[in-house]
Structures are given as C-alpha cells and as structure tokens.
From Swiss-Prot:
Main location: nucleus
Keywords: Acetylation, Bromodomain, Cell cycle, Chromosome, Coiled coil, Isopeptide bond, Nucleus, Phosphoprotein, Transcription, Transcription regulation, Tumor suppressor, Ubl conjugation, Wnt signaling pathway
Residue numbers bearing the N6-acetyllysine modification: K328
GO CC annotation terms, alphabetical: chromosome; nucleus
Its job: Acts both as coactivator and as corepressor. May play a role in chromatin remodeling. Activator of the Wnt signaling pathway in a DVL1-dependent manner by negatively regulating the GSK3B phosphotransferase activity. Induces dephosphorylation of GSK3B at 'Tyr-216'. Down-regulates TRIM24-mediated activation of transcriptional activation by AR. Transcriptional corepressor that down-regulates the expression of target genes. Binds to target promoters, leading to increased histone H3 acetylation at 'Lys-9' (H3K9ac). Binds to the ESR1 promoter. Recruits BRCA1 and POU2F1 to the ESR1 promoter.
Region (Disordered): 35-132, 253-312
Classification lineage: Eukaryota, Metazoa, Chordata, Craniata, Vertebrata
Keyword NADP: no
The name this protein goes by in its record: Bromodomain-containing protein 7
InterPro entries, alphabetized: Bromodomain, Bromodomain-like_sf, Bromodomain_contain_prot, DUF3512
Gene responsible for this protein: BRD7
In-chain residues carrying the UniProt-annotated modification Phosphoserine: S279, S289, S380, S482, S621
C-alpha cells in the first residue's frame, strides 16, 4: 500500500477562511413586525455548520484510531487530561465563532429611527378625515364610487364648457357632473340621497338633450341613467343599509334628527325622543339579526308605529292651535259644499287660468283639446318634420337638343348624357307638350323681346296681325283709348274729396243736423263700412288701446309663426328661443292689458265663477247658473262701446 500523505496545516481551515459569512438585513414595515432577510441561502448556512460538525467528527475518529494504537502507553489519567483539554479547546472555539457572528449582525443591522414613515402619516390623516365625515357623506361617497364605475370613458367626470361643446350654456341652463356632485358632498350640501338622485338624473338628461340620439354621448348617458337608477333604487339602498355599518348609522342619525325636531315642536318631546331612540336601537338590533324576514317585519312594525305616533302628534297640535285661537279657527266638516278639487296631499293647490265659463262643443269660445296639450316634451327625435323630396327615379328627363349656330352641320344635335329615356320618347313628349314643363314661358315672344328695341316689337305686332287678321292692332288701340278716360275720372274724384274735406267745419262747431250729415258723408267716403260712434272721448281712447293691442298680438303671432316655421340648423335639437322682437311685442301687450285692466272693475274682466274655478272650488249647479255671466257670446247687432267710469275707490 502506498504511504498516506498528511495534509498541510494551512489546508485544514481553507474552506472556513474563504467562505464569507451571510449578511442579514432587518426591515421594519409599518408596525413592530421585524423581518430578517439574508443574502446567503439558508441551505448554504446549514451546509457550512454541517461541514464543521463533519470535520470535528472526522478528527474524533482519527483520535480513536490513535488511542487504539496507543493502548500500550501506560497512564489512563494522561489520556483523560488530554481529552478534557481538547474538549475545552473545542468549547472555546465554538464560543469565539458565535461571538464573531453576533458582532457581524450588529454591524450590518440598520439604525432604527423613531420617526414614523410617510405612509402611516397619510393613512392616519385619511382616517381622521373619514372619522370627521357624517354617515350621510360616507353613504353618498359610496354611491358615487359605484356610479363612477359605470362611466369608464369619464364623459361625465368634469364640467362641460362652451369650448368643448359649442352653445352648451345656451341650451343647458343647469349643468351637472360628477366633480360638482363630489364637491357638494364634501361641503355637506346634500340633505338626503334623493337630492343626489335628482342631480344624477339632471346630469344624464342634460347630455341626452344636447346630443343627438345617434351619438356615443347620448347612448352613454342613456346607459348610465339606466344602471344608475338601479344603483339608487330603494331595494339596493336597503341592502346597503343591512350590509354596511355606516348606512345603519345614517338611519340612526336621521331618526335622532326627527326626534329632536318633534321634541322642540311639542310639549312631551323628551318621551317621544326616548321612544325614537328605543325604536332606533330595536331597528339596529333587527339589522344585526341573521334572518331577513325578521328584519323586514321589524322595519314594517317600526314604520307603522312611527306613522301612528306622528298622526297622533299632529292631531294634538291641531287641537292645541284651535284652542289657542279663541274661536277664530274651527274644524270644517267633510260634507261641506265647497272643496278644492286639485288639492295635493300636502294641502297645497294650484291656480288655473282665469276663464269665465266652460263652453260646450259648438259654441264660439270652445277650445278643443289637442295632442300637444296632453303629451309632454319629446324625449328623443327631432323637432321638425321630414321634408318631402321626390325620388330621382320618378322624374323623366328627355334628351336636350343643341344649337351651335351656323356652320355646325356635323356637330351633335342633342345631348343624352343626363336623359333617362330614348330619343323617340323625347320627341313624342316634345310633340305632345310643345316645351319643357319646368320652363313654360321661356319661348314666349314678349319675354323673348323684352330687352330688344322698337323694331322687333313692330315685327312681332305685324306677325300677330297676320295671324289674327288685324285683331291684335285693334285691341291695342282700344286699350290705349280707355287708359286716359280712367285717369281723368280718378283725378276728378280726388279733387272732389279734397274740396269736401276742406269745406267741412270741425265737428265741435256743428249742430245735430250737420253732425248727421257728416256721419253720412263719412259712410260714403268709407265705401259703405259702418262707422262706430263713441259716447265720450274716454271710450274712444279705450277702443284705440284695444285696437293697438290687437295689432300687437297679430304681429306677435306672425313673428312666432316665422320663427317656428324656419328650419333649424342640423346640429341643434332644441327649438330656437324667442327673438328680441317677440319679447318686445309681448312686453307691450302685457303693459297695454295692464293699463286697460286698471281702468275697469274686476267684475268687468272675469266673473266670480271663473275665479272660483281657477282656484279649484266646486259650487253646486243652481248657484253656478245664477252667478256667472257669459262674456264670450257674440252679439248680432253692433253695440256701442260703453266705458264704466270709476272713481279712485274703484266703485
């Protein structure tokens, strides 16, 4: 066997010296948790220590072999001492390695600062803002996030300006967008979810009004409105109240507000508020219960209880007000003859248009109900009817004959470029009708010679004389002779009228017989038109004012017809607004009617029945027949206009 070579002393710790110890990093993220990361893998560290242990075991085996070979050496105590020394040396080496590793970890560990990082600061500020928000604001923000998810293109995120959409401010008077709604939520301008719902509807309807139905903005607004109404429906809001904590808090805060209001208005408000709080606690307990049916039943019971208590409170308040009035206020019985027909549930009514009577079909003042009165504004489509346009295939276009003048024998005689019938059919049409139907007067002799001199006219007259055997010239002579006689007759009539007007004296200086003659003369000069006679100057002024108002109304109607009959531009869906002339005429009519109404009593303008009908008061039929006067019936004979002179007191 060959001789074993001993390892050199420098080779014993070669692996331990050149293998670098792994670096460890200590990271602190947010809280107090510490994670350790090492540059070397854990397997590498374990392999390092395993190699050391194997190396020590290998030494022990060698020592055992040596001991077996040194059995002849006497003295077991010496062997024990050697073993103890070696074991102590091993322990010291291990302690030294562990101390060096701890020092390396301390050198590589980062310095931990006491200042918190930036992210926890921002998160804490956001939490503070969330804590400061009311439950209603949190609920509205939650709904806004759901609504904005339905607008992926962000069409409604920011306000629309006239630079983006021309004429937007003229058409849309109340703009709305998501950013404005968020600002309102931040400023706590919304008092309920219904106000947010109304603004959302306004935003979608504005986009549908300004844009045409075929645009992407119109379709996006319609889709957003459909999905948003589902999000803002009562069922979805109730489910949110059961699933989200701050929605339940929103319900509690509403009840607390209602309780404080009722406590301030009534005498026993404290008990009522405690009852409200108990009901709120019961409802919160019901919301926590797992069964949905029990929740609905509890909510229904609480609502019924709240309504009944509210009715009792209102009844007590009414009784107390009636007692405090000292007999001025009394309870009206239900079976009274007068009542409001258009009364709303909240007690309000509407004022209708003043009209004296209700005409029947066939009467002169009857106004039939039209479709525009019963239907509202068009939600989609255009505001004008489609104009009629004849199809080009239905129009017959014959060939066009050409004339180049002299020396054009070999030129083409007709042009069939735009013709849709053959030449034979065109000749048949020309032979039947003589000329083109669109231009019937182009071949007229007089229009053809309109710009010519006298000589062509003489030639044309002679040609017509030949055709009519002299009848054309005789007709021209008769026409020339009749014209001077008519002119002389009209001149004599004008001079006679001027003489009569200058010779007549003013009507104030004439007696009754001369006034009758003057009236008869006026009737003659007005060609038989009856002249209206006034009893006083005030009546004449009043009638002139009425005539002026009638003229203004006609002008206003003409201006409106002109505006509404014009075709609007294709980029506008809405109708054009009233012009300045229409506004001015309407203001003049209003002022004239106001002046006329100030000069008469209210009974001359409208009847008692008309006022009561406008207020919605129903009156029994016999009383109604005796109280109103029909102001719309036409008279057979012309009446003289009478003006009621009223004093300053209106009597």
């Amino acid at each position: 066997m060959g001789k074993k070579h001993k390892k050199h002393k420098s080779d014993k710790h070669l692996y331990e010296e050149y293998v670098e110890k792994p670096l460890k990093l200590v990271l602190k993220v947010g809280g107090n948790e510490v994670t350790e990361l090492s540059t070397g893998s854990s397997g590498h560290d374990s392999s390092l220590f395993e190699d050391k242990n194997d190396h020590d075991k290998h030494k022990d085996r060698k020592r055992k072999k040596r001991k077996k070979g040194e059995k002849q050496i006497p003295g077991e105590e010496k062997g024990r001492k050697r073993r103890r020394v070696k074991e102590d040396k091993k322990k010291r080496d291990r302690d030294r390695v562990e101390n060096e590793a701890e020092k390396d970890l301390q050198c590589h560990a980062p310095v931990r600062l006491d200042l918190p990082p930036e992210k926890p600061l921002t998160s804490s500020l956001a939490k503070q803002e969330e804590v400061e928000q009311t439950p209603l604001q949190e609920a509205l923000n939650q709904l806004m996030r759901q609504l904005q998810r339905k607008d992926p293109s962000a069409f409604f995120s920011f306000p629309v300006t006239d630079f983006i959409a021309p004429g937007y401010s003229m058409i849309i008077k109340h703009p709305m967008d998501f950013s404005t709604m968020k600002e309102k939520i931040k400023n706590n301008d919304y008092q309920s979810i219904e106000e947010l719902k109304d603004n959302f509807k306004l935003m979608c309807t504005n986009a549908m009004i300004y844009n045409k139905p075929e645009t992407i903005y119109y379709k996006a607004a319609k889709k957003l409105l459909h999905s948003g109404m589902k999000i803002l429906s009562q069922e979805r809001i109730q489910s949110l109240k059961q699933s989200i904590d701050f929605m339940a808090d929103l319900q509690k805060t509403r009840k607390q507000k209602d309780g404080t209001d009722t406590s301030q208005s009534g005498e026993d408000g404290g008990c009522w508020q405690r009852e409200r709080e108990d009901s709120g606690d019961a409802e919160a307990h019901a919301s926590k219960s797992p069964s949905k049916e029990n929740k609905k039943k509890d909510n229904d019971m609480l609502e019924d209880k709240f309504k009944s208590n509210n009715l009792e409170r209102e009844q007590e308040q009414l009784d107390r007000i009636v007692k405090e009035s000292g007999g001025k206020l009394t309870r009206r019985l239900v079976n009274s003859q007068c009542e409001f027909e258009r009364r709303k549930p909240d007690g309000t009514t509407t004022l209708g248009l003043l009209h004296p009577v209700d005409p029947i079909v066939g009467e002169p003042g009857y106004c039939p109900v039209r479709l525009g009165m019963t239907t509202g504004r068009l939600q989609s489509g255009v505001n004008t009817l489609q104009g009629f346009k004849e199809d080009k295939r239905n129009k017959v276009t014959p060939v066009l004959y050409l004339n180049y003048g002299p020396y054009s024998s070999y030129a083409p005689h007709y042009d069939s470029t735009f013709a849709n019938i053959s030449k034979d059919d065109s000749d048949l049409i020309y032979s039947t009708y003589g000329e083109d139907s669109d231009l019937p007067s182009d071949f007229s002799i007089h229009e053809f010679l309109a710009t010519c001199q006298d000589y062509p006219y003489v030639m044309a007259d002679s040609l017509l004389d030949v055709l009519t055997k002299g009848g054309h010239s005789r007709t021209l002579q008769e026409m020339e002779m009749s014209l001077p006689e008519d002119e002389g007759h009209t001149r004599t009539l004008d001079t006679a009228k001027e003489m009569e007007i200058t010779e007549v004296e003013p009507p104030g200086r004439l007696d009754s017989s001369t006034q009758d003659r003057l009236i008869a003369l006026k009737a003659v000069t007005n060609f038989g038109v009856p002249v209206e006679v006034f009893d006083s100057e005030e009546a004449e002024i009043f009638q002139k004012k009425l005539d002026e108002t009638t003229r203004l109304l006609r002008e206003l109607q003409e201006a409106q017809n002109e505006r509404l009959s014009t075709r609007p531009p294709p980029n506008m869906i809405c109708l054009l607004g009233p012009s300045y002339r229409e506004m001015h005429l309407a203001e003049q009519v209003t002022n004239n009617l106001k002046e006329l109404a100030q000069q008469v009593t209210p009974g001359d303008i409208v009847s008692t029945y008309g006022v009561r009908k406008a207020m919605g008061i129903s009156i029994p039929s016999p009383v109604m027949e005796n109280n109103f006067v029909d102001l719309t019936e036409d008279t057979e004979e012309p009446k003289k206009t009478d003006v009621a002179e009223c004093g300053p007191g209106g009597s």
